[in-house]
Amino acid sequence: DALEKKASVYVINRENVVWLCEKHHWDFDMIVIDELSSFKSYQAKRFKALRRYRPKAIRVVGLTGTPGNLMDLWAEIGILDMGQRLGRYIGAYRDRFFLPDKRNRNIIYSYKPRDGAEEAIYNLISDICISMKAEDYLSMPECLYHRVEVRMDEKEEKLYRQMEKDMLLPFEDGDVDAVNAAALSGKLLQMANGAVYDENHKVRHIHDKKLDALEDLIEAANGKPVLVAYWYQHDLDRIVERFKAVPLKAAGDIRKWKEGKIPVAAIHPASAGHGLNIQDGGHILIWFGLTWSLELYMQCNARLWRQGQRETVMIYHIINKGTLDEDAMRSLEQKDCGQSAIIDAVKARIGGVNGASRKDD
């Protein structure tokens, strides 16, 4: 109905882009894409649909705080200039600027930039791209990052090392296993948090070290509202059980948080993305479990650290020493959170364990 009305500006969410392109007569002469990174997949329907109708628009503007890696730029820039700078085909772009990295004979799993590719790509797109940091142009509060380290006891660490080495943790009524490096990454991060799903999706308790650290941080907040970022459902269940935390899912709960009426709230990074304004409710964010996604990490942090925040933002990361937590944190800090970074981290851990066990033998 809204499209039938005459207006200067129309607003639509990205989930309806395909519908808009296929069902509506295209008569827009300008397109503004908020969060251009959501069009970084050249295989996605929304990218293909918008690319098909892009020539009908005179001007296109794309906004994003997380453009991704060099490979992602092909689709994002292609939406803007219709392939003028980086080429019309992903294959040609890949051949020109990248080399195969991880492969199994003819199967290529990842690519790495050629020498000088990064500078060359940036030079090609520099005339249509501008980078601005919010803190350089807006009144932004200070943001401080902290690490809080925990360590498992000998019995708990033994279980972790067994899973790391064998990719299997046997129980009488259901094993915890991983079929590949990516799956093992998920299992190890779960165990670092304190619990893990077995093959029957039953939760296996490992330790409470992170819950204890979270309790200390909540007490140190001295009554100020705390927002806890979790990744796995069993993390949320344990946080809710111990601290009576309120998940920020319903509109009513979000409203109460913004009014300062929720002492401990929990949020999943995937639901804390673009456009959620909750900075009025607090200034303390605690990462109970980490993610490999730099975009989700940055967007979640930006829910509190943004214009309108009146306090210094405190972001804590609870890190389990000697676990994959350290690798995930390092990847986030180095802004290297691709699939290859995950696999490299797991392989390095496995290699270290297997090497140590061979020496013991």
What positions do the PLM features span?
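Conserved helix/coil segment N-terminal to the catalytic DExD/H
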Residues: 2-30
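Conserved Helicase C-terminal RecA-like lobe
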Residues: 139-281, 343-361
